[in-house]
Amino acid sequence: MDCLTLKKSNCKNCYKCIRHCPVKSIRFSGNQAYIIGNECILCGQCFVVCPQDAKQIVDETEKVKVLLQSSDPVIVSLAPSFIANYEGVGINAMREALKKLGFFDAEETAVGATIVKTEYEHMVDSDTRDIIISSCCHSINLLIQKYFPAELPFLANVLSPMQAHCKDIKRRYPNAKTVFIGPCVAKKDEAQYYEGIVDAVLTFDELTSWFKSAGIKLDRETDSDEHSRARFFPTTGGILKTMAQDNPKYTYMAIDGVENCMAALKDIENGKIHNCFIEMSACSGSCIGGPVMEKFHRAPVKDYMAVAQFAGNKDFEVDQPDSYELQKNFTVIERRLQPPSEAEITEILHRMGKTKPSDELNCGSCGYNTCREKAIAIYHGKAEISMCLPYLKDKAESFSDNIVRNTPNGLILLNEKLEVQQINKAALKIMNLRSPSDILGDGVVRVLDPKDFLNVLQTGRNMHDKRMYLAEYDKYVEETIIYDKEYRLLICIMRDVTQEETVREQKENISRQTVEIADKVVDKQMRIVQEIASLLGETAAETKIALSKLKESISNE
């Protein structure tokens, strides 16, 4: 089971998770980020920095509730950083609240820390290793197992405080189930990988949600115990603070933050560090800076003070197991990634638009530190070419510039002060301007009537295909004005329709002349018809008179 999951619909392509992932164990495909399980060290930085909360820690609350339904006692191992997360709430108040949820008991993981630090002291006194690296932090263990396998011999083969404590609980309560509660994502993986010691892991956030749903309020009750020095464990240098540090052979040092730890491991790899006991913590500030703490409760100074005030001056009184009972074996975790050849990297860089060294900006906007690192990620299928912001910007600008340059329509871009910000060649031609410098930065009133622009700006209603005559340029244009509210810009598109208008006028003239000729022909024909009718009328009258006279003459005879 993966400890970190993803809300697919929430990813917004900001690449922040890649940028903050120290080992770049995130694959990006189809506008979606995916965590690569066999490369991830579970530091939780992607969970912390994701602005969309697209990364989720797998919630084991239901699993714990199932454990509570059994007849076996379920005992909590509570990480010592709880005092920083739950301000003013001591172990007794936490124990009472946890019992209300159904737990049999709750103990401090610091008990296990005392066991572990004592074993470290034995190692320092009896071990022949040049360097000893603490193995309390599971993320650091994974970092060494996956990325620095040559340094595995230096990793202390000792159980973590969580494991040592839960193992001690099961020694005292053979039928017990153990649940660790802390600020860490990696502990969920550690519990799963090393089966039979820790039965479930909850984060402080999961516990807080459970308290709220159950209606349990924590009593602000602090307590103190002189025998509780191991409560310092969740702070940077906390392990060393509990150790004797009396072996002159070793230099004792504490390193926190994955980047710093990686730098130290590289120095060890290169033979630059010797005779050291190194406390390593993946989180800045150690466990009080864990992902759940950093995400929801980031107050490093205040948290350290809370831990320091809660910790005692002496060790917990515990039964120290034999060393063999505390042994933990670490093996190399293979990642199986073959590096690309130089030719393959160059070919990918060319596809990214990086044809020469000066093109490699190494801006980091894609999440990778260098363009070459990004090219290698593309080769391994972890990244896409489209993730390069300068590449996309250049591509978009080239595309838009080609459109602006080559469109036959005039384009003018104005700000809200009606000042010309951009103008293309077609618009220059319409307005008889020689170059953009003749008008850029000046008011549009110099070349066009601003009335339509003001109307669009004031009403917010765009104007489309308004035909007008520009008398000063003796040209007809169809003008469209669009107001971009987001960028506060006015976009004017002018189509020169002078030729169309000339053709239209010519056609109108021809039509008018044709109508006039037709009217003249009709008039002439009507006159001819009228003349013919008049002549026919006179002839008919004369004929009638003649016939009448002929009729009368015949009748008289």
Model-identified regions with their sequence ranges:
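Short, charged amphipathic alpha-helical "coupling" segments at sensory-output junctions
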Residues: I385-N406, V503-I510, V521
